[in-house]
Every structure is written in C-alpha cells, then in structure tokens.
Amino acid sequence: DRGAGEPAARFSTPLSSQAMHALRAQFDAIAVGSGTVLSDDPGLDVRLIDGRSPRPVAIDRRGRLTAAARIFSRPGAVCLTSVSRDDLPPEVSVITMAPDADPRAVIQALGRMGISSVMVEGGAELLRSFIDSGLWDDARVEIAPITLGKHGKSRVSLPSGTLTVASADGGNVIINVKNDGDSVN
C-alpha cells in the first residue's frame, strides 16, 4: 500500500501498456472493484492507440467510492452498488444490486444496458469472483521481475486453461490463459 498522493508503481513496459490499450479497445466495458478505484484512481480509457474507450464500470458493493473518483468523470460511467448513490454525477448510470450479488447478476445487469463484452481489469477479489464463477473466456497476466516490500506476494493465481507464454520488453513475461470450459460470450 502506498501513501496518499504517491503515484502508482509502474510494472508494465511501454510495449505491454500499448498492448493493454489495444485489448481495452475491443470491449464494450471495463470493470474494476472499489479497492482498485480507491488505490489507483484509474482512468480506464484507451490513450496509447487509436481506438474507442470502453465504458468504465465500478463495482462498489459497500458505497465506498466518492464522486471525485476519476472513473465517474468518464462518459458512460456505470456504478454497481448496494447503497443509494445520489451523490454521483447525474451522467453516471447507477445500478442498485444486492450486496452479495454474484458475477452473473453483474453481467446480466450490464447486458440490460446493451453491454455485451466486459474486461475485468482488477482487483484481485473481483477477478477471482469472475474466474471462480466460470465467467471468463481469456485471462492475461503480466509478470514483472519486481518485488514490492519485504514480502512481495502474488495477488491473483492463474486459472486453469490453455497457457501461452510470451516475453515482453524489459524482462516482463505475458501469460495468456484460454478457458477450456464452456465459453461465456
């Protein structure tokens, strides 16, 4: 964890960042959990290539996010929450869900908004919930040769599937996993 005002650590290389933006441009929406928004305040847009930015989706089950989060200033922003969110800008689509709503309910709610493809970018808890529910087609993991803190630890383990490994510039390794089970489209 970093202190307030400290910039996020950069793990991606320029080449892998560009590839990530190309991947983002392929989806209708990009989803993150409230922990990721609170720690990183991501823009969830496409900047490094020419392409359409997906709709940003914040899954904020406990109502921890504020209107100041950068995600809520983006066009088409969506907030899935279990609490009243009258404090968010009127342009933000707020979907109220049960606090224990599973990933299928999230996908169904987004589908009713015309969103047919979702990239789940983080954090670890949200990613794990989609993987455990079988609601994934492909997973992409970038591993940087960096350890943070005294006891660096992996936040997300790889799901089962067909692995493809590629090296990226700067010593990073890209692992792609294809779901061998029933595909969810």
Model-derived regions: residue spans:
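Active-site ligand-binding patch in enzyme domains
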Residues: 1-117, 125-128, 184-185
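Active-site lining segments that contact anionic ligands and/or coordinate catalytic metals
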Residues: 54, 115-117, 136-138, 170-172
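Short, ordered loop/turn segments at secondary-structure junctions
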Residues: 84, 144-145
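Small/polar glycine-rich anion-binding or flexible loop at a beta-alpha turn
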Residues: 123-129, 146-147
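Short acidic amphipathic segments
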Residues: 126, 130-138
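Shared catalytic-loop signature of beta/alpha-barrel
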Residues: 138-144, 150-152
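Conserved histidine-centered catalytic loops in small-molecule metabolism enzymes
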Residues: 152-185
